[in-house]
Structures are given as C-alpha cells and as structure tokens.
A protein has these predicted regions:
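Short acidic DE-rich linear segments
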Residues: 2-4, 37, 55-60
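Conserved short acidic donor-positioning loop in nucleotide-sugar-dependent glycosyltransferases
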Residues: 30
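Short, charged, amphipathic alpha-helical segments
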Residues: 7-11, 33-45
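Short, charge/polar-rich alpha-helical segments
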Residues: 1-15
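Amphipathic alpha-helical coiled-coil segments
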Residues: 17-24, 42-60
C-alpha cells in the first residue's frame, strides 16, 4: 500500500465508523440491545484497523 492508498482507506473507514455510530443510536432508540452489542464490537474492530492504518501512515 502506498501513502495515498492508506489515506484513502483511513477516510473510508472513518465514514463507515460514523455510519455505524448512527446505526447504534437508532438501534438503542428502538430497543435492540442485542444488536447494539454486535455493532459495538464492529466499532472496536474498526478502531483497531484505524490504529494499524495510522501506524502505516506514520511510517511514510
């Protein structure tokens, strides 16, 4: 991956993260606690991916 690809992947992941947060808010509002837990786990995975990508970006 070159620097531009890493930057694009970070931007794309940030958009997905924001969308996922909105989905969690909707699930909480509608009382779907079980689905909220799964969605929060996906957020944690996204956070880990962001850490890895930011580390790669720092290496450039």
């Amino acid at each position: 991956m070159d620097k531009q690809e890493v930057e694009f992947a970070i931007a794309e992941l940030k958009m997905d993260y924001a969308r996922q947060q909105g989905d969690i808010d909707k699930l909480e509002t509608n009382g779907h606690a079980g689905m909220v837990e799964k969605a929060e786990k996906r957020l944690e995975l996204m956070e880990e991916q962001l850490r890895e990508l930011n580390q790669k970006l720092a290496e450039f």
